[in-house]
Amino acid sequence: MSNNLEINNREYPSSFSKTAIVICLDGSQKEYLEEASKSNLTPNLDKLIASGENLLVHSAIPSFTNPNNISIVTGQPSSVHGICGNFFYTPETGEEVMMNDPKYMRAPTIFEKFYNSGSKIALVTAKDKLRTLLGNGLSFDDERAICFSAEKSD
């Protein structure tokens, strides 16, 4: 019997001896960070990178904030997790609907699965539109999970 968690057909260690920090810089390029580092503009990020991992992922297509971030936290493409854009058009009403509601998600996030296995989860996002998607499946009543955005941190 494995002590790993299976999340969307991928295995992850079920317990960590170290803290995991995931930083998604949507719309950035690694060259921007390299130049900032050379100019000593990112000392804290440089320390995190030096003491851990620095992994580059390819963007999901379509290359928009919501599908890219959800692909990162589910390990799946939009066709599997369900978030195919930032908005979709509803012909019946003629309106654009923002895809920031978890009801559109068809795959759990790594955060949800680790939370359900007993882990504590802290999520911080710059954009509030991602908060409900990233925090999907977490309960904020038992002090094991927190999720907020810098955009609406008050």
Residue ranges and their predicted role:
Residues 26, 72, 114:
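A residue-level signal for conserved active-site and pocket-lining positions in enzyme catalytic cores
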Residues 18-19, 39-43, 67, 105-112:
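A structural signal for well-ordered alpha-helical segments within the folded catalytic domains
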Residues 34-78, 122:
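Short, structured active-site-proximal loop/turn typified by the sulfatase FGly-forming signature C/S-X-P-X-R
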Residues 2-53:
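Active-site-proximal N-terminal segment of extracellular/periplasmic enzymes that hydrolyze or transfer
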Residues 27-30, 62-64, 121, 128-131:
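Solvent-exposed loop/turn segments at secondary-structure junctions
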